[in-house]
Amino acid sequence: DAPYLSKNVIRDEPLHGCAFNGAMTMSSNLKDAVILAHSPKSCTYLSIQTISSAGRRTLFERGNILPSSLIPNVLSTDMTETDMVFGGSENLLATVKKILDSPEPPPAIVIVSSCPSGIIGDDIDDALSLSTERTKIVTVKAEGNLTGDYLQGMLMAYTSLAKQIIEKDIEKRARTVNVVFEKVVARNTEMNFQRLKTFLARMNISVNCRFLCNTSYESLRDFCSAELNLLAYRDYTGKILEDFFIKEYGASFFEKQFPIGFKETSDWLLALGKHFDASDEAKSIISENEIIYQNRMKLVRPKLEGKKLMIITYNHELDWILNAALDCGMKIVKICVLNFSQDEGFRSSLSEIDGIEVVENYDRDERSSDIKRLKPDIILSNYEPVSEQSCITDTIPMCPDNGFFTGLEMVERWSRLFSKSKEGEWLNDRKLFDKYYSR
């Protein structure tokens, strides 16, 4: 039973990843639980590669070690051909008992089923009877491609863990919030959380549970103790989770998602400050950062004013960069939104873009003719495109940084790009650059 479905499952599109992998990734963020994959070694191995990707990337790029990402809390039943023929339930139960008999058993064992265990009909719910006072057994019937894509597995983990762990009858704690739906694979997730946590601390607001990101069994169990829930992303999945928690637990959600850029961050702080009677502190934070924002914007405006910007992106919310572009006097000539499996429906609260051409489900084949017709000075996209002879290109992150200066930092980069020449110190190397890079 999966009442909350991914776009791929609803539209019967080719799958993007498998449900087992998505469920494993999200479940592993319950950091003090053991995540038990009822699968062959190969399936577990692939999931561990996904789970550890952010940690490995951080280690290689910055030299920082994130043990929770590099050494995930994952075990496997290591299903064999014998299990596939005669059934793997005995193997599963034996593995669970071995974990329970360890010197320090975890508060929870989350069992996730895979394609092989689903195909042969192993019922992982058989292990529920092994729960003890110290350790709760939780099951997620993901069953790989049999159930759906990666996002479907995420949704199943979200809802299954919530229904089996969260206690409804629990006392509310004043000035406490939960954070819902952070993007766990994005490398800036922890940095974004810490930045906004600093703002919350200044307004005397504490965080209980991060659902589901680097959190604990106890904080998830006490989810309903929070006074308010903060949604990190109000996209397709974020809105599903908001709807789920409202229907299942009567949860209250803050109307704004995590803010990106100066205007969104200011509005977010003012609204949150009003809710928690901390308006003075919110205004103080905004004033401190507004001075910095305006002074830095003055430096880039002379170089960017009047420049034409064209955007081709999978992102469905762009107000943070549109605001920054408008603040420095740029002209936005076209916004092209590509079809994306994780979101749908372009969203903007800016009246300033009413006269701007916005195309959803943009056809990439129109790119060349649009560039020739609109003659943009800069093209913004999610990927590094083929070199354009007539303009500068730059990339837009799928998961931008939160806070006041996200859009500002991007337009500052554009300003530096316009100040540079491809020729640089190599003088005539521009011909070689154009010849080979444009292929």
Which residues fall in each region the model found?
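An N-terminal assembly and electron-transfer interface module characteristic of large anaerobic redox
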Residues: 1-439
